[in-house]
């Protein structure tokens, strides 16, 4: 029988106990940590049932898996000041290259995080090594809509876990770890008790050149972002402007578009972006126009600070219902004279599944607001363009923030905050910019 990665990984435990044949054992987790409602839950030793021996995929299949998860891992790691290479290696190691039952659809739990996610969980048998022996338990594990939410949850664990003496995983952050090897060393004995955990991660990172995903972001990156604008007068009373913006931690295309008064589509078009994923340190061209009283054919260079943004349509009224036994999206769409697609859009549903007790928006009307754009700038000719303030309020997420708390603070419904910021779940990240009004 082939020797699995996990057997090799936990070889130091062989003398203490025999591994039950009915289970598969990945990385040993920290025994005292627990992830419930966004904090770390108990996972000492996760054993997944298997029907056949698990063997590492061939190199080409490995690269396919790496690329498939890197698209989610890199932006999440960058936004949280973590090494993408380490996060990808963790996902590979914890899920055995995505072959564990928990990591596959429809569960997408790459890191074995316990608890519930948006009310969803799945029960698996786990084993914990307690008092010198293995104890088997049935425990609930989080079910995610996609790998992206799994990475976000893992980042939340690494950034917010605190047992009273400061952030528990702080030494694994890029700001405190000069190299990825320093980060993996900091995880060993904390994230996993296996003494070879860091070495296993380092081997994967080196073998598959995962440092290529660490990109422009560097340890201790203090880049606060910024923009430089070149304004060109076209003799018609309108200045066409091109702003170069440097992406910083927590930025999203939506947040940048709101601050600069242009659409996400405009940013994507100007920068040939095929998705909404952006990276720390990336340069983005933001194009727009500003009215001016200049009448000559002069070129002016200016540094500018954005002061306005577009105000999207605001919900003026909405009807919500609590799902009861027998309800379906189809029945609700018929009853409230709307479409299933519209219900899914309002409620950010990725499938047609709804749950008893779930609150759903079933009707919503909105009044469009006129966009206002402009920027205050200091140019070489000492002329200033006027600007107007939008009604939007942008908030930078700090430790302890929740959607519910921001909703209470701003007076805006949670559903509105999620709609304005294109959030598909209630998970928000430290450093993230959110429109809350």
Swiss-Prot record:
<keyword id="KW-0378">Hydrolase</keyword>
<feature type="region of interest" description="Disordered">
    <location>
        <begin position="367"/>
        <end position="392"/>
    </location>
</feature>
<protein>
    <recommendedName>
        <fullName>Probable N-acetylmuramidase</fullName>
        <ecNumber>3.2.1.17</ecNumber>
    </recommendedName>
</protein>
<dbReference type="GO" id="GO:0042742">
    <property type="term" value="P:defense response to bacterium"/>
</dbReference>
<keyword id="KW-0929">Antimicrobial</keyword>
<keyword id="KW-0326">Glycosidase</keyword>
<keyword id="KW-0132">Cell division</keyword>
<feature type="region of interest" description="Disordered">
    <location>
        <begin position="217"/>
        <end position="244"/>
    </location>
</feature>
<dbReference type="InterPro" id="IPR051056">
    <property type="entry name" value="Glycosyl_Hydrolase_73"/>
</dbReference>
<dbReference type="Pfam" id="PF01476">
    <property type="entry name" value="LysM"/>
</dbReference>
<feature type="compositionally biased region" description="Low complexity">
    <location>
        <begin position="290"/>
        <end position="317"/>
    </location>
</feature>
<feature type="signal peptide">
    <location>
        <begin position="1"/>
        <end position="57"/>
    </location>
</feature>
<dbReference type="GO" id="GO:0005576">
    <property type="term" value="C:extracellular region"/>
</dbReference>
<keyword id="KW-0081">Bacteriolytic enzyme</keyword>
<dbReference type="GO" id="GO:0071555">
    <property type="term" value="P:cell wall organization"/>
</dbReference>
<keyword id="KW-0717">Septation</keyword>
<feature type="domain" description="LysM 1">
    <location>
        <begin position="243"/>
        <end position="286"/>
    </location>
</feature>
<keyword id="KW-0677">Repeat</keyword>
<keyword id="KW-0131">Cell cycle</keyword>
<dbReference type="GO" id="GO:0004040">
    <property type="term" value="F:amidase activity"/>
</dbReference>
<comment type="function">
    <text>Hydrolyzes the cell wall of L.lactis and M.lysodeikticus. Required for cell separation during growth.</text>
</comment>
<dbReference type="InterPro" id="IPR018392">
    <property type="entry name" value="LysM_dom"/>
</dbReference>
<dbReference type="GO" id="GO:0003796">
    <property type="term" value="F:lysozyme activity"/>
</dbReference>
<comment type="similarity">
    <text>Belongs to the glycosyl hydrolase 73 family.</text>
</comment>
<dbReference type="InterPro" id="IPR002901">
    <property type="entry name" value="MGlyc_endo_b_GlcNAc-like_dom"/>
</dbReference>
<feature type="domain" description="LysM 3">
    <location>
        <begin position="393"/>
        <end position="436"/>
    </location>
</feature>
<dbReference type="InterPro" id="IPR036779">
    <property type="entry name" value="LysM_dom_sf"/>
</dbReference>
<dbReference type="GO" id="GO:0000917">
    <property type="term" value="P:division septum assembly"/>
</dbReference>
<feature type="domain" description="LysM 2">
    <location>
        <begin position="319"/>
        <end position="362"/>
    </location>
</feature>
<dbReference type="Pfam" id="PF01832">
    <property type="entry name" value="Glucosaminidase"/>
</dbReference>
<keyword id="KW-0961">Cell wall biogenesis/degradation</keyword>
<keyword id="KW-0964">Secreted</keyword>
<dbReference type="GO" id="GO:0031640">
    <property type="term" value="P:killing of cells of another organism"/>
</dbReference>
<keyword id="KW-0732">Signal</keyword>
<feature type="region of interest" description="Disordered">
    <location>
        <begin position="290"/>
        <end position="320"/>
    </location>
</feature>
<dbReference type="GO" id="GO:0061784">
    <property type="term" value="F:peptidoglycan N-acetylglucosaminidase activity"/>
</dbReference>
